Structure formats: C-alpha cells, structure tokens
Amino acid sequence: MDRRRMPLWALLLLWSPCTFSLPTRTATFERIPLKKMPSVREILEERGVDMTRLSAEWGVFTKRPSLTNLTSPVVLTNYLNTQYYGEIGIGTPPQTFKVIFDTGSANLWVPSTKCSRLYLACGIHSLYESSDSSSYMENGSDFTIHYGSGRVKGFLSQDSVTVGGITVTQTFGEVTELPLIPFMLAKFDGVLGMGFPAQAVGGVTPVFDHILSQGVLKEEVFSVYYNRGSHLLGGEVVLGGSDPQHYQGNFHYVSISKTDSWQITMKGVSVGSSTLLCEEGCAVVVDTGSSFISAPTSSLKLIMQALGAKEKRIEEYVVNCSQVPTLPDISFDLGGRAYTLSSTDYVLQYPNRRDKLCTLALHAMDIPPPTGPVWVLGATFIRKFYTEFDRHNNRIGFALAR
C-alpha cells in the first residue's frame, strides 16, 4: 500500500503511536481492546501551549450537524480531550485504523489517501486506500461534519469493515480534509459512531446496526469499560454482552428519554449533601467519545462555586492540588439512584505542571434548543461506572467498575 510517510519534523514533534492488541473472539460476544493515550489537551498542556489563545483561534472542537445534512446529530463529543481508542479493519485485506468508539455520533470515518497534502494532519495518520481492497465499492456522495471553526470533509465509500472479529459491509466516510487542530496531535485515526441511525450524517446505517442485522450477538447490547489506571491498557468495548470481571454487583437500568439517542433523564445533581441542580429533571447523554462531564454554563458555575474552584482560562476550572482530599463528592441522580464521584474521580493532576494547580474534569457546553440544553457524562463518569448500552430495551445500565 502506498501510505504517506510521516515527515521527520512530525516524528520529532509527536510521540510515537502505540501498537494495539488484536481483538479476541469468544463464543458469546466480541471484545475490542482499548488503549489509553495522552489526550490532545494533555499534550498541549505539557508543551506550555496557551489553551485560551488556542480556543480563540480554532474554536471549541465539538461536533455539530452538517449544514448539508437533513438529520440532526446530537452535538456532543469534544475530541480535544479524548483518550481511549480501539482498532478496526477496513477492506480486503483489512487496512488497520485506530478509532474512537463514540456513542454521541453514528458515522464511521477515516482519513483517505486522497486527502490533499495541504492537510498536514492526514500525513501522520493511517490512510484508507480503496484500490488496495478487493471488496471496495464506489459511492461518491459528499460527507461533511463540522467542528467549531473547522470541518471533516470527504466522500462516502463502501467496503468490508471488521470490528471485534465481526465483518459487515459498511458505508463510511473517506476524509479528504482534516483540520490541523486537534487531529495533528491526535493518536486516533478516525471515529466509529455507536449512536442511532437518526444521528447519522447522510442517512448511513451505523456499523452496530449492521452487526445487529446479522444476528451473531448473544444480546443486542454493547458495553464499555474504561480503566482508571494510567497505563496504556485502557479498557474494552464488548459487543453482545458485558464482562463481569470489570464490574461488581448488578446493573441498574435507566430507560432512554429521547428516541434515537443515548439520552436519559437526570433528577438531581448534588455537591456534598446539597442538591443544587436538576430536581425537575435535566437531559443527559452518556457519551463514550467525551472525556469530561459537561454541563450548561450556568449550572457549571454553581457547581464550581460550591467546590471553591476558579476559572483559570477558557474551559478550565482549577483548585490547589492540596485541596483535593477535602473536596466534596458530586452525585448524579439517575433512575432514582445516586451515582457518586469522589474528588479523586473528577480531579485531574498533571505531574509536570509547575503551578501546583489541579484541573477539574468538568466543562461548560451550551447547546441551544431543540437539542439542548443537555448534560454529558463522558469518561470521567464511565471510569467509575461500567456502562451497558441496550438497544433491544432502549436503556442504559450502570454498575460499579472494578
């Protein structure tokens, strides 16, 4: 395959990508190993990049609907903070790509060899080459997803896609325009949306729906485990069931509150013993593609006030690291049960930071109606609570991770 080589300056700039374990197959369900890598934000923080200036110049890298799309994808994932990636194959023979498994979207896309050399980010990622695949079929329809001030743009193609040992024929995006930020520093190549068909740009049937149509899974569910440790073995996605080795007790299920979205209703947010928000109910999406917990700005300010946190710069609230052991718990009422995060769950400590400040893994995100306002429970929450997404019963299950 004629893949683009990473320029020498890029090799010096970036850390080397990590090698992924191959998926292992069982008789009842499929496992996709995940690895945890430094997020783009962490890389920039360690290099002393001013995130305030970066945000002003490049915008917030949160996906929003394509202006040319007739559907309305949920506006969720902030890929600037994403850390967990798995491996899939596209084509015959398979071409390997590292992707985010993202419940906040429904499309699969990867960079293409047809990406212009003007887009430097394409040069450091694995690129799909259709001529190397005997199972490729041309589609050619335009494909666009907007990200703040940038966009991911290309065209649709069809080929065999292998996920966790299961192969389906899939329409996906070949990306030919890839923004420099955040993808120049991102360790993942593309995104595999695990959302519902109504969220898909271009009316494409999502990968998981194609898998369900084969009837090969024991159950019409998938589950996500994110390791809380700092090592690279970051967790796993299980198709068709869940893995009791990674959770304790039983699942508590909450029905989805919005058709065709992994959205549920939250009936309270407490800091310490005080319920501050959402007693009348708030919409919340459980999003595997987001690293942090996101809330409307007005709600986040109340939480930060209760925690005594200060806004250091755009999208970053901090506390003195010496305060972390004394910070109160934050609890989320989901389906009549409190899911509690301690300060060690929601505070990030960067070892190389010199100002002795710790960052809170909560961000502001304001989404206008009709989609919003909405909260997002990302990896900060999922690391504590093993999560099962049940398509058959339209519900999400939570169990304490271990």
Swiss-Prot record:
Residues 22-71 form a propeptide. Gene3D superfamilies: Acid Proteases (2.40.70.10). It is found in: Secreted; Membrane. Changing residue 58 to R: In allele Ren-1D. CDD domains: renin_like. It comes from the Eukaryota. The active site is at 102, 287. This is Renin-1. It comes from Mus musculus.
